[in-house]
From Swiss-Prot:
This is Probable GTP-binding protein EngB. Mg(2+) binds at S44, T66. GTP binds at residues 37-44, 64-68, 82-85, 149-152, 182-184. The gene is engB. It comes from Coxiella burnetii (strain Dugway 5J108-111). Pfam families: MMR_HSR1. InterPro entries: G_ENGB_dom, GTP-bd, GTP-bd_ribosome_bio_YsxC, P-loop_NTPase.
């Protein structure tokens, strides 16, 4: 058994470092899975629930709080990465442009990146920036898994309807994109997303 074959111990996650510039990233070794999404889509809450560590990724009622790339080590070789939230209107355009350049460089150049989790509020899916991020990742041949978060905010039928609509919208991208319902409140989809992450971590370099 290789060091990547067993499922990671997500509850062992520990804050590693933060980077505001590409040259501040930790060594491009091992395996990383990154989380990205619009401000207040539930990205930090998803990371906290997946690891079972309350407050691991800081949550805030003020969108746009995460302005750096934050790294969390699961072990010596595997990391979860919290990318800056986007789409917050009060962030100056210069800051937004710097964010776009940093994230684009990360997705394009980070060789240890195994997959990208795109977090979307199920009530407001596939906004323009969501689609831009998906386009970036597809162009760089990065596997994508979409979390439609806050599914508890909709009825079961409404959530399934939105799931189907988003599935239809992304079908042109083929098998590179998968998606699911998720709720940090009632833990809907927790086992499913963990299975996806573990599969990515076990994939060949």
């Amino acid at each position: 058994m290789t060091e990547f074959e067993s499922a990671p111990a997500y509850q062992e996650a520990k804050y590693l470092t933060s980077a505001a510039e590409f040259d501040q990233l930790p060594p491009d070794q091992g395996a990383e899975i990154a989380f990205i999404g619009r401000s207040n889509a539930g990205k930090s809450s998803a990371l906290n629930i997946i690891t079972g560590i309350k407050g691991l990724a800081r949550t805030s009622k003020t969108p746009g709080r995460t302005q750096m790339i934050n790294f969390f080590a699961l072990n010596e070789h595997e990391r979860l990465v919290d990318l800056p939230g986007y789409g917050y209107a009060k962030v100056p355009r210069m800051v937004q442009k710097r964010w776009e350049e940093l994230v684009d460089s990360y997705l394009k150049k980070r060789r240890c990146l195994k997959g990208l989790v795109v977090v979307m509020d199920i009530r407001h899916p596939l906004k323009e920036m969501d689609e831009d991020v998906i386009e970036w990742a597809v162009n760089y041949d990065i596997p994508i898994h979409i979390l439609l978060t806050k599914s508890d905010k909709l009825s079961q039928n409404a959530a399934k309807k939105t799931l189907g609509e988003v599935q239809t919208a992304i079908s042109a991208y083929g098998e590179k994109l998968t998606l699911q319902l998720f709720s940090s409140h009632d833990r809907t989809g927790l086992d499913e997303v963990k299975a996806v992450l573990s599969q990515w971590f076990r994939s060949e370099p």
